[in-house]
C-alpha cells in the first residue's frame, strides 16, 4: 500500500477522464511516484485495484468474469455484480447523503435509474464497486470463517485464509482505523481491544463499505456480523459501532 504521493495526481489518474478499462487506469497509476517505500507506512489506496488487474492479466479474463466463475457461482451468490441489468435493477435500493438542516438528500435513485444499471460497463475495480445482498455477502464471510469452505465447496486453502487474517503491517500506525489495529490481506485486524475500544475479540477481522456497511469475522466467538445501510458520508452517526456493541451485549455464553 505505497500509493500515492500526490493526491491530485492520484485523483486524475483514477478518474479524470474516466478510464475505459482497468488496464488504462492502472497504467496511469504506474506512472506516478510512490509516497514512500513499501513497508515504511500504511496508506489507504488503490492497491487492490492493481491486484485486480493482475488477476486479469494472469487469468486472461476480466475481473467480473473471474470473480463470477471462481467465487460467486461456486458460493451460490446470484445477486453479486459490478453492474445490474433491468431484471435486477428494480431491487436496488436508493442511496442517500445528509444535507443541511438535518435533511436527507437522494444521492442515487436506485432501481433501473441507478448508475449501477446505466453506467458504462467497462471498469471492474478490485477496490470496490460491487453491489450485493446481505445473504450473498454472508455466504462469502461464512466461507472465510470456515477456513475457505462452504457447503462442501472449497474456495481457498486453510493456510491461505490464515494468511489473509494475520496482521501484515507490524507496528505501523493504521490511521484509518486507529490504535490497537493492524491490517491483513483485505481486512482490518483487532490487535488490542483496550487500545482499539472495539467490542470484537482480539484477532477478529473486519471492514466496512463506502455507504456505511460493516462486516466482521470473530473466530473466537464463531461469529459473522453484517450490517447494510445506504448513506454516505456517515461520520455523523455511530450506527456501525452501536450495532457491534449490541451484538456482543446479546451474547450470554
Question: What is the predicted role of each segment?
Answer:
Residues 1-202:
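Short, surface-exposed loop or secondary-structure junction motifs
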Residues 87, 220-221:
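Short strand-connecting beta-turns/loops that link adjacent beta-strands
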Residues 100, 219-220:
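Short, ordered coil/turn segments that flank beta-strands lining enzyme active or ligand-binding pockets
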Residues 188-189, 216-218:
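Short, well-ordered beta-strand micro-motif
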Residues 206:
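Short, structured beta-strand/loop micro-motifs enriched in basic residues and often containing a Trp
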Residues 209-211:
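Short, small/polar residue-rich loop motifs at catalytic or cofactor-binding pockets
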Residues 214-216, 222-231:
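Short, well-ordered beta-strand elements
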Residues 232-253:
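Generic C-terminus detector
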Amino acid at each position: 500500500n505505497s500509493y500515492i504521493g500526490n493526491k491530485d495526481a492520484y485523483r486524475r489518474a483514477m478518474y479524470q477522464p474516466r478510464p475505459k478499462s482497468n488496464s488504462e487506469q492502472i497504467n496511469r497509476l504506474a506512472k506516478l511516484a510512490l509516497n514512500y517505500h513499501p513497508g515504511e507506512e500504511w496508506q489507504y489506496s488503490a492497491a487492490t485495484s492493481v491486484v485486480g488487474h493482475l488477476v486479469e492479466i494472469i487469468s486472461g479474463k476480466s475481473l467480473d468474469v473471474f470473480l463470477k466463475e471462481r467465487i460467486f457461482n461456486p458460493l451460490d451468490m446470484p445477486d453479486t455484480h459490478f453492474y445490474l441489468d433491468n431484471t435486477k435493477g428494480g431491487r436496488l435500493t436508493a442511496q442517500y447523503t445528509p444535507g443541511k438542516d438535518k435533511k436527507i438528500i437522494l444521492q442515487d435513485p436506485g432501481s433501473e435509474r441507478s448508475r449501477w444499471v446505466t453506467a458504462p460497463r467497462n471498469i471492474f475495480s478490485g477496490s470496490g464497486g460491487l453491489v450485493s445482498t446481505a445473504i450473498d455477502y454472508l455466504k462469502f464471510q461464512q466461507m472465510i470463517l470456515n477456513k475457505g469452505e462452504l457447503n462442501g465447496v472449497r474456495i481457498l486453502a486453510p493456510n491461505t485464509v490464515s494468511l489473509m487474517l494475520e496482521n501484515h503491517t507490524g507496528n505501523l500506525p493504521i490511521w484509518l482505523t486507529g490504535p490497537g489495529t493492524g491490517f491483513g490481506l483485505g481486512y482490518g485486524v483487532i490487535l488490542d481491544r483496550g487500545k482499539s475500544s472495539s467490542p470484537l475479540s482480539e484477532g477478529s477481522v473486519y471492514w466496512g463499505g463506502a455507504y456505511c456497511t460493516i462486516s466482521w469475522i470473530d473466530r473466537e466467538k464463531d461469529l459473522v456480523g453484517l450490517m447494510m445501510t445506504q448513506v454516505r458520508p456517515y461520520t455523523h452517526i455511530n450506527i456501525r459501532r452501536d450495532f457491534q456493541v449490541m451484538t456482543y451485549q446479546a451474547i450470554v455464553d
